[in-house]
Structures are given as structure tokens and as C-alpha cells.
């Protein structure tokens, strides 16, 4: 008996293996004519067959034969004289084939013995139980549907293989069930977000991906050029200003799930191309947006994990209880009780402390931006359970409505979980004159060297001048939410094809 599987193939030169497989393909073309047939129609998947028949005993399957038509990739092969076994994997799982020379015929059996792991097979047969009780397909017809020319790796481990996992996601998905599960969960999460929004009477819309003026967030854009119009365009950094134009137009509850692009660094938390949901609702403020954010995240946890208590990096995260709330100064003092109110109101002390902690001074002037910079150094990473940080300074919130009680702050929040930002929302600024003044301030910051400051968007001001109702808005990062709910250490683990440096 000989046995092969993808975790125990002997080391062999890949070029030699591929040459041998190409020779086999040439022989198939010569003898069969059609090497990649497309007339086989699968009717059954592995997982439903196991679910329905694993508990059925051998005698019952023999008494009432169950005919099946299955197909998938061969992941294991055991050749034993006149009979062999093959384990085949489809999108739902794996099932074993029992292949006997007497059933499939001498020619097909001889062909099967030359086939390789990774080849895609189609089979017709009846269900059976082996001596060990494993549900299998006793094959009566067997076909090679697609020849695999490149051998599958044994497994992924270590840094080099982690890189390969991201670069060749198609291989990762073949051999790594955890990766397949992650992306199935991702799909469930996106579907759940959409269900929540539709259930709240929001309208799903699509807004431009290429903008004549970048806006809606503080970030560096990717720049491209429209040849016919001979003008620069920017891949969108956020859909915010277009979505709020729709609220002006009378679409009072809108949302969009789509990509944003930011021409910035890559890390375990950042990919230049990422997915967000942004949603806007007229006649509400940031309290309603926080309520919606909690609802979305809880529902996604229930859909993906079956519970609102999840584990991340070995530590529990409770998404079921009401999310905590702190102001920026409140969070700093909560996690750093040694700081005094006098220190936190002293611009010189704040600058000194930020530098002492290894942080960078913010480009935006003002005590509020310094407090935010200190928060990022000494408190943000400690926000493990869901926490809303509220009332951001006006100088770093150019699109948020100012507080009636304190004009130095805005009705803005960010949500932090496991020390990472997951959402950003606010009561929208709907005073066009105030918005124009803030845009001018952003332009001054850009002229002073702040690459992430916003441009002046005259058309958005024109839209606001028609009247933007009191509105709340929020954006939630889908990739980071998937990271949280799949216990993924890197954003690359939850994006099918993350950006990588050239090989």
C-alpha cells in the first residue's frame, strides 16, 4: 500500500514535479482529446452528506443505497492493489472515495493511480461505511476534471510561509480550514451589517470611488488622471461628503459598504485599501449613532460567533454590556491617575509629556489636539472592552457639529475595542458658514505642511447652503471588526488579497 497526502509528500524539486505533471497532461490530451472537460455536474456536497448520513449504519446504507454525484480536489490518496482510497475536498468539507478496479474498470483505475494530489475529480457512486465506520462514496464512475500542474505545499509555518499565505491566498484557502472559516465569517458579518441597516429603514447607495477633490477624512489620497477630461482624480478616502449630499437631497437614511483608499503606511492594522460602512440619518445626533454602532457590533458578534462574549488574543471581550464612555481627558485620568487637571491644561507640559512617551506633536495647534495626542500615547491602547471616547476637540474634527455648551469641543465619538479604533461618528456640522470657515482652517494647515489636512470643497458648501437637516453619521471599519470577531492578529488575515511589497 502507498499513501500520500499534502502534509507528507517527500521533498522534491518543484520544477521536476511540474515537468512530470505537464507530461501527464500531454498524455491526457493525446489519449482523451479533452483534458479539461466541462460536462460534469455535481449534485452533492460533503458536509450535508456527513450531516445526514454519518449516523446511518452500514447495513442500512447497503439495504437502501444512496446515490451521489460529488466532486472536489484530491487531498489524500492511498493505493492498495485492486482498491484505493482518496480524500476529496469541496467548499463544504471533505469526503472519502473508495475506488475499486472492479467497479470503475481497469482503464480508469490505471489512470487514477497516475493522478496527483491537487487534481480535481468528479465521481458518481453510492454511500457506504468502511470497516472503521467512515462514511465514504463507493465510486462507480470516476473522472479527472482538472489537472493540477503545481504541487501543493506541505503546510504554512514561519515568516516566509506567512508571506506566502498572503501572496497566494488561493493556496492558503485550499489547505487551511481556518482561513476558509475566517472569510466565511467575514461574509456573514457584512451580510449582518446590511440586514441591520435595512431593518432600520436605511437605503443602500453607491457613491463615486474617484473624487475631483479628496475629502471626508484626514488622510493622504492616491492620485490618478482622467485622460479625456485632462484632470487629476483621487481615489476616495471616505464617502462622507457625497453621502451627506444625499441627505440634503432628501434621502434621510443612507448607508454604503464599500472600499476606501489611503496612500499611507501598512501595518497589522492598516491596509491601503480597506472596507467600511458609513451611514447617515437625518434628525438625530451622535447619541443615536452610538446606539446604532452598538447594535451593529452586537448583531455581528452573534451572527459570526454565536455570542457577544468573544476572545481576542487569549483575553475575553464583552460586547454584550453597555459600552463604556469617557471624554479624552477622562480616559487619560482614568488610566493615568498621576496626571493632574493643571498638567492636562498646560500646553508646555503636554508637549513635554508627549515627547517623553515617544509620541509626535500634532500638526494641528490647540490644547485639545495636544490632549488627544497624549491620549493616544497613554490611554488608547488600554481600552480593551468597548469604549466610546466622546467630545473631540474642534481642531481635529472639521466636519463635526460643535457643542452648544463648549465651542472648543464637538459632538463626536470614536469607538475603541482591544486598544484599536473601530468606529468614528458625530453629529454632523450643518452650518455652511461654519463649515466653510473650518475648510479654510484646514487649507491653512495644509499650506503649513499637514499632508492630511482637508481641501476646500466648494460644491459641498453649495449643497449645504440648500439646507442639511440635523444629521448624525458614523463609519465602522469592516476589516477591524472582522479581525476582532475572528481573533485575527493582522488585517492581512481578514483581507483576501492584501497589498504586499513586490516579491
From Swiss-Prot:
Cofactors, names only: Mg(2+)
Keyword Ligase: yes
Binding site for Mg(2+) 1: 414, 421
Record's signal peptide: none
Co-factor binding details: Binds 3 Mg(2+) ions per subunit.
Keywords: Aminoacyl-tRNA synthetase, ATP-binding, Cytoplasm, Ligase, Magnesium, Metal-binding, Nucleotide-binding, Protein biosynthesis
Name of protein: Lysine--tRNA ligase
Cystine crosslinks: none
A Pfam family per the record: tRNA_anti-codon
Amino acid at each position: 500500500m502507498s499513501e500520500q497526502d499534502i502534509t507528507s509528500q517527500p521533498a522534491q524539486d518543484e520544477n521536476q514535479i511540474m515537468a512530470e505533471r505537464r507530461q501527464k497532461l500531454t498524455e491526457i490530451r493525446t489519449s482523451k482529446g479533452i483534458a479539461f472537460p466541462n460536462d460534469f455536474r455535481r449534485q452533492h456536497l460533503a458536509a450535508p452528506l456527513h450531516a445526514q448520513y454519518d449516523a446511518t449504519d452500514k447495513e442500512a446504507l447497503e439495504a437502501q443505497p444512496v446515490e451521489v454525484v460529488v466532486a472536489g480536489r484530491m487531498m489524500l490518496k492511498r493505493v492498495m492493489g485492486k482498491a484505493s482510497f482518496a480524500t476529496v475536498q469541496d467548499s463544504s468539507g471533505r469526503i472519502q472515495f473508495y475506488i475499486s478496479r472492479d467497479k470503475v474498470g481497469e482503464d480508469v483505475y490505471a489512470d487514477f493511480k497516475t493522478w496527483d494530489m491537487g487534481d480535481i475529480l468528479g465521481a458518481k457512486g453510492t454511500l457506504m461505511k468502511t470497516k472503521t465506520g467512515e462514511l465514504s462514496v463507493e465510486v462507480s464512475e470516476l473522472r479527472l476534471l482538472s489537472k493540477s500542474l503545481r504541487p501543493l505545499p506541505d503546510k504554512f509555518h514561519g515568516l516566509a510561509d506567512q508571506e506566502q499565505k498572503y501572496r497566494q491566498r488561493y493556496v492558503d484557502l485550499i489547505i487551511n480550514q481556518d482561513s476558509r472559516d475566517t472569510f466565511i465569517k467575514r461574509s456573514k458579518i457584512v451580510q449582518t451589517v446590511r440586514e441591520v441597516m435595512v431593518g432600520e429603514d436605511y437605503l443602500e447607495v453607491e457613491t463615486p470611488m474617484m473624487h475631483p477633490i479628496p475629502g471626508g477624512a484626514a488622510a493622504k489620497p492616491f492620485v490618478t488622471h482622467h485622460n479625456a477630461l485632462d484632470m487629476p482624480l483621487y481615489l476616495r478616502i471616505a464617502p462622507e461628503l457625497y453621502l451627506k449630499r444625499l441627505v440634503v437631497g432628501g434621502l434621510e437614511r443612507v448607508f454604503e459598504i464599500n472600499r476606501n483608499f489611503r496612500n499611507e503606511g501598512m501595518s497589522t492594522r492598516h491596509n491601503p485599501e480597506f472596507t467600511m460602512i458609513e451611514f447617515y440619518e437625518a434628525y438625530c445626533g451622535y447619541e443615536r449613532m452610538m446606539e446604532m454602532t452598538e447594535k451593529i457590533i452586537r448583531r455581528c458578534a452573534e451572527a459570526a460567533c454565536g455570542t457577544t462574549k468573544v476572545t481576542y488574543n487569549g483575553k475575553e471581550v464583552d460586547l454584550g454590556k453597555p459600552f463604556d464612555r469617557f471624554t479624552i481627558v477622562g480616559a487619560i485620568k482614568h488610566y493615568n491617575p498621576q496626571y493632574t487637571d493643571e498638567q492636562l491644561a498646560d500646553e508646555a507640559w503636554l508637549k513635554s509629556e508627549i515627547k517623553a512617551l515617544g509620541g509626535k506633536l500634532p500638526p494641528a495647534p490647540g490644547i485639545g489636539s495636544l490632549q488627544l495626542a497624549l491620549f493616544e500615547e497613554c490611554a488608547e491602547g488600554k481600552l480593551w472592552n468597548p469604549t466610546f471616547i466622546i467630545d473631540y476637540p474642534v481642531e481635529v474634527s472639521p466636519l463635526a457639529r460643535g457643542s452648544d455648551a463648549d465651542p472648543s469641543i464637538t459632538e463626536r465619538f470614536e469607538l475603541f475595542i482591544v486598544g484599536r479604533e473601530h468606529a468614528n461618528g458625530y453629529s454632523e456640522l450643518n452650518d455652511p458658514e461654519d463649515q466653510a470657515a473650518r475648510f479654510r482652517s484646514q487649507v491653512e494647515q495644509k499650506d503649513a505642511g499637514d499632508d492630511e489636512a482637508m481641501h476646500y470643497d466648494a460644491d459641498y458648501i453649495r449643497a449645504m447652503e440648500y439646507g442639511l437637516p440635523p444629521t448624525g453619521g458614523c463609519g465602522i471599519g469592516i476589516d477591524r471588526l472582522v479581525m476582532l470577531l475572528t481573533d485575527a492578529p493582522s488585517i492581512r488575515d481578514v483581507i483576501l488579497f492584501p497589498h504586499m511589497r513586490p516579491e
